[in-house]
């Protein structure tokens, strides 16, 4: 069996054009990563492709959880986090299936946590300018100013607050009360980062280039951005009123670019 301390969680819904390619790209890396696919009942046969790869080639490093219906990005990741913790992984990654996140950046996020000692590594589009390729300008501006808005309202100094390309050390996910995470859509990304920050975990932004999907259909919608926009007010209120758990060794929250 290929042993690994790291697992990449990939939520999917109708990703048949991308899923085999992204799995093979991750498994081609020198560093050994495992993959957990969380599929929300894709009618296009995404799960069937994963099962074929598990049976024919990757039984010891590729896994899948199939859910019934579209239950939300946040709940997909929380399901994956719990599975990863139960299976004793030390480094737990979030990544999209559509190549908007470059698999070649996974070792860089891993190094930030494993070698440099950070608790959370964020693949950041905005820490060194705007590094987005092939997105419509309206969407670039919406994403960029959404992150600016989160920073302004919460006082949270991460540049890319809505980024979905991350590495967590397991102790972060063991400490955050996953059952209390409120947001199911893309507001989930800001909530997880902000909660880790308030608890006192060390966070590093690693600059990456985000590339718009080459195949398949985007799952973004106005409702997703609405949740993220209005949810920020709740995050700020939580920052004032909520008692966050503290890690024993926590000092001042640290964010490094």
Residue ranges and their predicted role:
Residues 1-25:
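N-proximal low-complexity "stem/linker" segments adjacent to membrane-targeting elements
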Residues 24-33:
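Short, acidic, metal-binding catalytic loop of nucleotide-sugar glycosyltransferases
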Residues 67-86, 91, 103-186, 213-230:
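Acceptor/aglycone-binding surface of glycosyltransferases and processive sugar-polymer synthases
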Residues 17-21, 44-53:
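Acidic helix N-cap motif at the loop->helix transition within catalytic regions
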Residues 10, 32-42, 65-66, 95:
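Short beta-strand/loop segment that forms part of the nucleotide-sugar
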Residues 1-3, 155, 179-257:
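Hydrophobic helical membrane-anchoring modules
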Residues 5-7, 34, 191:
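Cell-envelope/extracellular polymer assembly enzymes that use nucleotide-activated donors
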Residues 39-48, 99:
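A conserved acidic beta->alpha catalytic loop
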């Amino acid at each position: 069996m290929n042993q690994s301390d790291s697992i990449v969680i990939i939520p999917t819904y109708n990703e048949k054009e991308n899923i085999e390619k992204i799995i093979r790209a991750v498994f081609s890396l020198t560093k050994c990563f495992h993959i957990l696919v969380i599929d929300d009942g894709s009618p296009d046969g995404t799960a069937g492709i994963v099962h074929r790869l598990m049976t024919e080639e990757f039984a010891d490093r590729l896994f899948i959880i199939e859910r019934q219906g579209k239950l939300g990005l946040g709940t997909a990741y929380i399901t994956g986090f719990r599975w990863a913790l139960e299976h004793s992984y030390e480094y737990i990654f979030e990544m999209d299936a559509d190549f908007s996140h470059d698999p070649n950046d996974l070792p860089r996020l891993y190094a930030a946590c494993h070698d440099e000692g950070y608790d959370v590594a964020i693949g950041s589009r905005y820490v060194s300018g705007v590094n987005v390729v092939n997105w419509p300008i309206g969407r670039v501006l919406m994403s960029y100013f959404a992150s600016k808005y989160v920073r302004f309202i919460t006082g949270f100094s991460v540049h890319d607050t809505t980024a979905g390309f991350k590495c967590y050390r397991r102790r972060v996910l063991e400490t955050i009360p996953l059952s209390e995470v409120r947001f199911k859509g893309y507001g989930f990304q800001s909530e997880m980062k902000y909660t880790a920050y308030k608890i006192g975990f060390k966070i590093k932004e690693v600059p990456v280039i985000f590339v718009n999907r080459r195949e398949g259909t985007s799952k973004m919608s106005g409702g997703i951005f609405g949740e993220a926009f209005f949810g920020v007010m709740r995050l700020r209120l939580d920052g004032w009123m909520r008692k966050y758990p503290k890690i024993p060794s926590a000092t001042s929250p640290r964010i490094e670019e």
